[in-house]
Amino acid sequence: MNSSTDNLFAKPYEQVSDFQFDDKVAGVFNDMIRRSVPGYGQIINTIGDLAQKYAATNTKIYDLGCSLGAATLSIRRRVEGRNCQIVAIDNSESMIERCNENLSAYVSETPVELICGDIRDIKIENASLVVLNFTMQFLSPDDRENLLENIYQGLIPGGLLILSEKLYFKEDKIQSTLDDLHLDFKRANGYSELEISQKRSSLENVMKPDTLAEHENRIRSLGFSQFSVWFQCFNFASMVAIK
């Protein structure tokens, strides 16, 4: 999955606009997310492992907020021969176009339906696996429970939700410590102080992280029988919930 180097915030802006998943971001997204999200590669690989365990024959798999298709590709490699259909959705035309190119580079018997649309408008049905990989944090807090309710209703019994999110911690010292470690991670990956500062300003109004307790309480209240964090590095985590 090719990507140009992310230097979108390398020059100073008089006014930093809100972050958008536009063509400029899509062109550097693979580099951006791997240099910004600790453990991203491990998460993508394990999504494939979990798909191998939970994808049921003759069911659907949903990748909600698929971006360039990394999770979809990881899943598709691991579910051959099960007559599954993957439905990959993103509201960015630029992401969908590049996702289609990435998927076309690999031959597979597992079909992928690519949809450019709002994940809040998609009816989940006959799903054995649903993936929200750093997607829900960009929805308004009011929309999150409705989305998860739709997912819960569309999952088959024993179906799996994979939810990866940046976390917020109410304990101020924990929050500041993990935030500092994340900033050090970005510095170690070549981002300058200017890039870090401007990217943070750009995301400030569009990404609203929840606490781990908020995630768990919301998921359990909808009826999911089991919940666990399977991965965490600093203030980034990936969770699983079983219907």
From Swiss-Prot:
Pfam families: Methyltransf_25 (PF13649). It comes from the Bacteria. Its EC number is 2.1.3.-. It is an enzyme of class 2 (transferase). GO terms for biological process: tRNA wobble uridine modification. Homodimer. HAMAP family: Cx_SAM_synthase. This is Carboxy-S-adenosyl-L-methionine synthase. It comes from Shewanella halifaxensis (strain HAW-EB4).
